[in-house]
Each structure stands twice: as C-alpha cells, then as structure tokens.
C-alpha cells in the first residue's frame, strides 16, 4: 500500500512538473528571450533638472507616459520663462534588444506659447538600442526627443545641455 501511495505521489509530482513546463512554454510563466525587452507601464514625471542645475517640479512641469504592449501615449506640460509649452503624442512601437521602431499617429505641440500645431501624418522612425546593467536606452528618431533610459524603477530622459527629466514607474 505504501508503494502504491508513493507511486501516486511521484506520478502527481511528475504530471505537475510537466504541466508547469508546458505552461511556461505557452507564456504562463517565464517569458521568451526572443520577445525582447519589456518597457510596458505608466510613468509619471517627478522633476526636471535644467542645464544650470535648477530642479523644476509640478505645477511648473507635469507629464505622463504610458507604454502598452505596442502603443505609446506621451503628454508633458511645462512653464519656462513665463511661457507655456506642451507636447502630446500617440504612436505604435516595437522594441527588440537591437532597435526601437516607432510609427507616430498623432503629434501636437505648443512651444513657448506660440500656439498649438497638430500633425496626423504618419511618420516612421528607427533607433538603435543599447542595454546595460538591466536598463535599456534609445533616442526616439522622431520629433527631436531626448535620449531615454528605462530601468525597473523608472525612466530618465536626457536632452544633453538642456535638461534631464526623472520619471517614476507607477505600474
């Protein structure tokens, strides 16, 4: 009887292990390395460091960035020198460990209070990707954007000689 129970317990363990392995193969557990890096999440702008070392925070600057599986939604507003500026964007993207590809569907900007401009013409950009110490970095090829470095804790956007924005990952 003990042998029978041991056999059943061993069989149950083996079946459970096999199911776990099959489940992982279908994406229920570990992710496939060929899927590329994952930047999905919502990021909130905490503060901007200007080139002269000044720290700018809300309400002078407010921003939110969301990456879903394949869509990016970006909104940022700032006030500098008494002039309001804002950028809003919706784009599809793909990301691998080698490149970031973006297809912009909507882009709007109001720079230095000059009035808003809209662009719904499809634009396409490809940027090389670098990965180091668990972070991914790239400079989106469209609209003169800053270099972006994303880690598990958040995102840092750097426009050399102009600003460095610090974004916290919310989810």
Predicted regions, residues:
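Lipid interaction determinants
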Residues: 21-88, 96, 101-171
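Positively charged n-region of N-terminal signal peptides that target proteins for export
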Residues: 1-5
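Bacterial N-terminal signal peptides
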Residues: 10-25
């Amino acid at each position: 009887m003990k042998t029978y129970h041991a056999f059943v317990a061993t069989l149950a363990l083996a079946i459970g292990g096999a199911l776990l392995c099959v489940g992982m193969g279908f994406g229920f557990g570990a992710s496939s390395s060929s899927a590329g890096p994952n930047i999905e999440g919502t990021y909130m702008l905490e503060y901007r460091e200007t080139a002269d070392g000044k720290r700018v925070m809300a309400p002078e600057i407010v921003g939110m960035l969301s990456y879903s599986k394949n869509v990016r939604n970006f909104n940022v507003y700032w006030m500098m020198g008494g002039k309001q500026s804002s950028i809003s964007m919706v784009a599809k993207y793909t990301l691998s460990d080698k490149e970031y590809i973006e297809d912009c569907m909507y882009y709007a900007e109001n720079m230095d209070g000059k009035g808003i401009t809209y662009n719904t013409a499809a634009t396409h950009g490809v940027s090389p990707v670098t990965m180091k110490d668990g972070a991914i970095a790239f400079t989106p090829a469209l609209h003169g954007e800053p270099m972006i470095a994303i880690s598990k804790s958040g995102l840092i956007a750097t426009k050399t000689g102009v600003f460095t924005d610090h974004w916290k990952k919310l989810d």
